[in-house]
Amino acid sequence: DLLSGVRSPRGFMLVCLRGEEAQFETDRRHMGLTELTMAEAKNLVPILNTDDVMRAALSTTAQDIDTDMMLQRFVGLLRTNGGQVETNQTVQAITKISEGWQVDTNQGQFTARKVINAAGAWGDEIAKLAGIPEIGLTPMRRSVARLAAPGGLDVQSWPMLFGPGERWFAKADASA
């Protein structure tokens, strides 16, 4: 199976600080999350400060994805089937032709029966070049802080944590 071993259980916990109750409730309902007592939440994530965290809700179905492993498997499958990966190029135009697609880059021109848009958050920009309707992707700048677990705690089994509106998140990093 192509995705065997790529996913692992994680779960996620939505946590609410004072003043975020309305957005928390909207998110909790929208995601169908089970609300926890503060004791239950603290049992799962012992460092939660229950003086600041007012409410918490949990999903046990969320999973981590080993994105590097997944990508390497997809690249292997692509190459096994005669495909190629082209990197470090700027796509300038994508044109539908009778044999499939023509892609013009700053490094040259390529033709293929199929083209995979792997631009992630910038996928709408590539879609636009191909005359394909945008779906509303918004690239966002993120900041990362890698911190040692407090007090030597084992955080690997903790759910991912995030706040209402998904303005921030925290999760154990397997490579830390």
Give the label of every model feature segment.
Residues 14-16, 104, 146-148:
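Short, well-ordered beta-strand micro-motif
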Residues 21-22, 71, 122-124:
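Glycine-rich nucleotide phosphate-binding loop and flanking beta-alpha elements
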Residues 38-39, 68, 120-121:
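Alpha-helix N-cap/helix-start capping motif
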Residues 24, 96, 126-128:
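Short glycine-/acidic-enriched loop or helix-start segments at secondary-structure transitions
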Residues 1-47, 53-55, 167-169:
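Dinucleotide-binding Rossmann-like beta1-alpha1 core, especially the glycine-rich loop
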Residues 3-8, 114, 119-176:
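Active-site substrate-recognition segment that forms the wall
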Residues 47-53, 95-102, 152:
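A short, glycine/Asx- and small/polar-enriched loop/turn
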Residues 59-114, 118:
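Helical element adjacent to the flavin cofactor pocket in flavoenzyme catalytic cores
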